[in-house]
Structures are given as structure tokens and as C-alpha cells.
A protein has these predicted regions:
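Phosphodiester-processing cores and adjacent nucleic acid-binding clamps
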Residues: 1-169
Length: 169
């Protein structure tokens, strides 16, 4: 008679921290804030010197801080950084990437990191549908790559993250 009960634990993600850039939490905060500033400069055409007094920017910054707090508390900064990394790599290597769909499109952090191309505040999307402290499962971005070139993305991931990569077909 077998009496095996599997033990489930939190996913183990590669360590994204570095001496130069700091912890994954610090890198996520910096990259997200840099991304938000870039969106306001390019999308909203607001000069950087006016950001700290712009009501719209302050609204976005409050939402960003709220999301970052939850992501960090739930220990998912590395996940967001890894997804951002391979999506930016794909875009820089002429691999078409979908704009973002599913509940992940509700994340302002994802938009700031270029994971999605959807401004969740503009479309009244709710972050907590994607990630909240009551959720037991790991968040999951629905990402679409060009079918002809998606193997290149997997090759990039396995080259960079080695044994930390798994792929379900």
C-alpha cells in the first residue's frame, strides 16, 4: 500500500539580484519607476520636471506603489523581472509579441516593465484579479509570441537561466 502525499511549495525562481543593482525587490522598484517615467514622457508627453506635481502621474505612482508592495510581499519580483527580460529580448530581436491579455493586463507594473502594452488605469483594469494576497497560485502572464520564432525565445531562456527553465507544451 502506498501512502505518498506530495509536498507543494512556492516556486523556486532564479536569483535576479546582483551586487551592482541590489536585490530583486530593489531592481523591480527601480525598473518599474523608470518605466513609469518613460511612459509619462513618451505616452502622456509630460516633461520630467513636472511629474512630481502632476495629478495624473501621482495617481499612477500611487497605484504602482500599491502593486509593488503586493508583489514584494508575495515574493514575486524575480518573476516579473524574468518575464520583462525575455519579452524585451524578443522585441529587440524582431520577434512579435502580443500586447497582453488576460488578468495580467491589469498590472501597472507589467505595463511599466513592457510586459504588456496595455495601460490598465486607462481601461479600468483591476490588478487584484491578477495577483492578490488571497491567491494561492503563482501569477501567470498570458504571452503570445510569433509561432515561427517562439523557439528562439525558449532558446534564449534556456541559455540565460539554464536548469531553472521548464516548458509545458
Amino acid at each position: 500500500k502506498c501512502n505518498f502525499r506530495p509536498q507543494f511549495s512556492k516556486p523556486v525562481l532564479p536569483n535576479i539580484s546582483s551586487e551592482k543593482e541590489g536585490s530583486a525587490d530593489e531592481i523591480l522598484k527601480k525598473n518599474s519607476l523608470d518605466g513609469l517615467k518613460e511612459k509619462f514622457l513618451k505616452v502622456f508627453k509630460i516633461e520630467e520636471k513636472y511629474l512630481k506635481t502632476n495629478d495624473q502621474y501621482l495617481k499612477y505612482k500611487d497605484r504602482l506603489d500599491h502593486e509593488l508592495k503586493i508583489i514584494i510581499e508575495m515574493k514575486y519580483p524575480s518573476y516579473f523581472l524574468i518575464v520583462s527580460d525575455y519579452i524585451k529580448w524578443a522585441k529587440n530581436n524582431d520577434i512579435p509579441v502580443g500586447p497582453g491579455r488576460g488578468s495580467g493586463a491589469g498590472s501597472l507594473v507589467a505595463w511599466c516593465l513592457s510586459i504588456t502594452d496595455v495601460d490598465p488605469i486607462k481601461f479600468n483594469l483591476i490588478f487584484e484579479r491578477f495577483l492578490n494576497p488571497d491567491r494561492v497560485s503563482m501569477p501567470d502572464f498570458d504571452i503570445d509570441f510569433c509561432e515561427e520564432k517562439r523557439d528562439l525565445v525558449f532558446k534564449y531562456l534556456t541559455t540565460k537561466y539554464k536548469d531553472s527553465v521548464a516548458h509545458i507544451i
